[in-house]
Amino acid sequence: MERYSCKQLKSLVASGVAKDVTYANKRSDIPESYTQIGYAAGIYGCNGMLLKGESGQLYAVTDRTSAIYIF
């Protein structure tokens, strides 16, 4: 698993490489099974994560929200 900065995760979303699921409310917001391939951590713990679906689509949680605990 690779470590990213929150800025890197946000740039992946801005460039269209990853889909933003920061404010997702349920697991079904990602319509396929996925695995975690990266994370962003700071002094208060996990601040973001990068997920990869079985189709190859990337999903990013770019802020410290409840989506970190859902996924």
Range-by-range predicted roles:
Residues 3-26:
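N-terminal acidic leader/helix
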Residues 19-71:
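Acidic, low-complexity, intrinsically disordered interaction modules
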